[in-house]
Amino acid sequence: MKHKSGKRSWKTLYFEFAFLGLKVIVSVKR
């Protein structure tokens, strides 16, 4: 994974965080 742009860094971080949150929500819902 290469990250040269700083703007893309927070975007990727946010995306990963959102994915993790969704996984947790699904786990709790189940």
UniProtKB/Swiss-Prot annotation:
Family membership? Belongs to the AapA toxin family.
On induction, the UniProt comment says: Expressed during exponential and stationary growth.
List UniProt keywords, sorted A-Z.
Cell inner membrane, Cell membrane, Membrane, Stress response, Toxin-antitoxin system
The listed locations are:
Cell inner membrane
Q: Which GO terms describe its cellular component?
A: plasma membrane
Activity regulation summary:
Transcription of the aapA3 gene generates a full-length transcript whose folding impedes translation. Processing of the 3' end of the aapA3 message generates a shorter transcript that becomes translatable after a structural rearrangement.
The gene that this protein is the product of is aapA3
Query: What is this protein identified as?
Result: Toxic protein AapA3
Species: Helicobacter pylori (strain ATCC 700392 / 26695) (Campylobacter pylori)
Reported function: May be involved in response to oxidative stress. Toxic component of a type I toxin-antitoxin (TA) system. Neutralized by cognate antisense RNA antitoxin IsoA3 RNA which forms an extensive duplex with the mRNA. The antitoxin gene cannot be deleted, indicating expression of AapA3 is toxic. Non-cognate antitoxin RNAs IsoA1, IsoA2, IsoA4, IsoA5 or IsoA6 are unable to neutralize aapA3. Oxidative stress may trigger transformation of the bacteria to a coccoid form via the AapA type I TA systems. The peptide may penetrate the membrane leading to lipid reorganization and thinning of the bilayer.
| Domain of life from the UniProt record | Bacteria
